Design a protein with these regions (language model features):
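C-terminal edge-of-domain segments
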Residues: 1-10, 147-250
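Short, surface-exposed beta-edge/turn micro-motifs
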Residues: 33-36, 107-110, 180-182
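An N-terminal domain-cap segment
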Residues: 6-61, 71-73
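A structural signal for short, well-ordered beta-strand segments
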Residues: 53, 140-142, 187
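Short helix-to-loop capping/linker segments positioned immediately adjacent to catalytic or ligand/cofactor-binding
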Residues: 37-40, 124-125, 142-145, 166-173
Length: 250
């Protein structure tokens, strides 16, 4: 497995011992979740948007509406009084998102983060309190996908969070595809940090205080599926959904 290339943006400067430079660590963080935070500049204003993602060996794929400013870099339409115009849900969804080149030029470099909190580190002193975590940060100029490449990325996105669902559910229609934007962001420039273990004050002067210290773990677990109340009687979840109940997400 290759190493991550260090750049001015991804070089570990603080807490270097927590930094990981192997690409396997990046994939580990990305596999463990399906929600990322996409940071963009829109109209000179920073925006951080939560969205679903998927990935392959080379790219991170993020999903959203074709009318979303965060996924197109377009300025919002304005009414005569200067406020953002509400053009109606259907009109926004059918609005064109611009070409691949236009989207890349409008958005410039973006930053995507994925973070998993594994526990609270409760130390003897408040100063030493902390968090056990796994975190990845990806920089890149997004590329808007079209055609078969877009459909392939949608499958990757769907299968990442819900394995088996792409083949089980109805495939997207042309109108649905037109209303959806998929961006590809290269994984070439990425940074990973991980922190685990107990507090750092177990051998210092605070150890004599007689206070409890340790880690309060956190885990995200899939619960039993909740059926749509409009389902026909007797229709049960398919195996690829039901089998996940009681399992950990990450």
């Amino acid at each position: 497995m290759s190493e991550l290339s260090a750049t001015e943006r991804t070089r570990h400067r603080r807490l270097r011992e927590k930094g990981r430079t192997d690409r396997a660590a990046l994939y580990e963080v990305l596999r463990a979740g399906f929600i990322c935070h996409l940071g963009v500049i829109s109209g000179g204003v920073p925006m951080v948007v939560p969205t679903v993602y998927g990935f392959d060996a080379d790219n991170l794929y993020v999903h959203g509406s074709a009318a979303s400013r965060s996924l197109t870099g377009r300025e919002p339409s304005r009414s005569r009084n200067g406020s953002e115009a509400d053009t109606g849900t259907d009109a926004r969804q059918d609005a064109p998102g611009g070409s691949e080149a236009e989207t890349s030029a409008a958005m410039g470099t973006v930053c995507v983060t994925v973070t998993h909190v594994d526990g609270l580190v409760l130390a003897r002193s408040v100063f030493e309190h902390g968090v056990n975590y796994r975190s990845a940060m990806v920089y890149g100029v997004p590329r808007k996908l079209e055609g078969e490449e877009k459909l392939t990325a949608l499958r990757i996105l769907t299968e990442h969070s819900a394995p088996g669902q792409w083949d089980y559910a109805r495939q997207p229609s042309r109108k649905e595809l037109a209303a959806t934007t998929i961006l590809a962001i290269s994984l070439a420039e990425a940074s990973v940090k991980m922190s685990s273990g107990p507090p750092d004050d177990g051998e210092g002067p605070d150890a004599a205080l007689g206070l409890w210290a340790g880690v309060l773990p956190i885990a995200t677990t899939w619960l039993a599926p909740i059926p749509d109340p409009l389902l026909p009687e007797g229709l049960t979840p398919p195996d690829h959904i039901g089998v996940r109940a009681g399992t950990r997400l990450s």
